[in-house]
Amino acid sequence: MKNHILLILALIFTSCSISTETKVEEKSLEYFQSEVMKPLGLPFSDAVIVDDIIYLAGQVGNLPGTLELAPGGLQAEAKQAIENMKAVLEANGSSLNDVIKVTVMMDDISEWGDFNKEYIKYFTGENKPARSAFGTSGLALGARLEIECIALKRK
């Protein structure tokens, strides 16, 4: 009986001393600020890249390098916001074809149909990104919409 107890204790102590070291793969992390937007001194990055995934900050329909919204209403702002999104993606080795998820925030959700008229010009074909949308108020610069996305980095 003593031998059994000693054997059990030996097994317990031996198993406790075995290293179960888990190696965590180091992730690459990069913060991107476009040269066009840098002079504005905004308190956020245009994108954060973690390994091969790009997380874009929300894009409103501002004209590049300014805090002025594209004139012409919701569709003009939508077009400019998507163009801004496209520029950030392309500067980081990606494209609209690599977008995985889109989130749309709208000042007036009843304008959803007008937004979609512009959106479908950019996201065509069979493989469209997942998308969420919601109505809100108080968007930056008094914008009527803001779009953010997550995309795959190809290059």
PLM features per residue range, with description:
Residues I5, C16-Q80, A87-N92, N97, ...:
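N-terminal presequence-like segments and the immediate start of the first folded domain
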